[in-house]
UniProtKB/Swiss-Prot annotation:
This is Chromosomal replication initiator protein DnaA. Residues 1-77 are annotated as: Domain I, interacts with DnaA modulators. GO terms for biological process: DNA replication initiation; regulation of DNA replication. Pfam families: Bac_DnaA, Bac_DnaA_C. One of its GO terms (cellular component) is cytoplasm. GO terms for molecular function: ATP binding; ATP hydrolysis activity; DNA replication origin binding; lipid binding. Domain I is involved in oligomerization and binding regulators, domain II is flexibile and of varying length in different bacteria, domain III forms the AAA+ region, while domain IV binds dsDNA. It is found in: Cytoplasm.
Amino acid sequence: MASLNENQKFWARVTELAQQSIGKQAYDFFIEPAQLMSVEQDTANILLDSGMKKDYWKKQSDLITTAGFEVFGRMIDYELYANDELTELELHRLNNQSSIEEQPRSTAKPASPLVSGLNEKYNFENFVQGPGNRWTLAAAIAVADKPGDTYNPLFIYGGAGLGKTHLMHAIGNQILTDNPTARIKYVSSENFVNDYVNATRKNQMENFENTYRNLDLLLLDDVQFFSDKEGTKNEFFNTFNALYDKGSQIVLTSDRIPQELNNLEDRLVSRFSWGLTTDITAPDYETRMAILLIKSESSRLEFPSETLSYIAGQIDSNVRELEGALNRVEFVARANGIAVVDIETASQALRSLKNATQQSLSNLTIKKIQDEVANYYHISFSDLVGPKRPKEIAFPRQIAMYLVRELLGTSLPAIGTAFGGRDHTTVMYAYKQISDKMKNDMDVQKDIDSIKRKF
């Protein structure tokens, strides 16, 4: 095994060569997050933050070869690992055999005795607050302040890309800052299952239980993907009970409320509801603008407010797609040598995204929207389009009219015809009612978002 000093020199040379040969954005995205875990038997073990980056790294053999000959005087091969592909046991093994120390960073947190999987870049300070996440953010801060005491478990639900995972990491990072010896683990439900299956296959259940049942904080992401296998569910049930009984904090996320998790048993679902269940909805216009302003500040390009306003008006689904849209606009601007990004450039960059959205809705019909709304509110199709006017029917009818107008752009008279021959002024009133509610009524925002996701 190479000495610690040699390993540090080797990795420093790899990164130096990379900085000299590739652009800053590529370096920051592909190279900077990578870690050298060890050099064993002429093989460098490199840990990436995502398996999606392996293809890029496979093309960087010249970096490894050159640095290997310069530092070790011999040929060095390399093996790639990825955080999102490794089981906890494998990652723990890699860390234990690691022979290179982390370089000190001003923002680094003291290491936890257990590999936590936390991402340092997610904290409460850089989480943008808005009407759709205000109460969930408050709950997350309360949990981080008094883990195991305030809301346990904390169950956060909402659509993809709205910030659920960000808040999970923020909770973990805050607790780790306050208590550097805290035993914290962030894991997806899929990786929990993988850890359990591997532990069972390798007869290492004692290690698995020690890993999970002695935590101070368990952050379990995307529980809707939990396996329906009996053994896995039993193990998680026992893990949940063990942690809860000893006062450890549990935070869970899902794309739906606990009662809609059909792959889980009632006994688990009921436990998810013991603490606080809270949701995150799509960001409103002001929140989207705030997110874009913050993100654009780190760009070398200038984004006038009217350009950011245009982008915010085009992307209203979730934060992830909003950030992706900004990145795409920046890429197009750089490719065309544009320093001050105008609306025309943004429109050009986002044209293909809008076309893709339109294509995904090309098979959507008025009838499909009506059926989905009727199903969502548990009323019949005939009541939805019929003459009945009680609130529990009139409100879903207004929602359906709003969605038809919003998603399909159907004319007001045509919508009226599809809803039992109603006058176009009735449709106009319904559309205005729901449009007004969408500005400040979180329940309506949540309903619209949930129904849209069905499409």
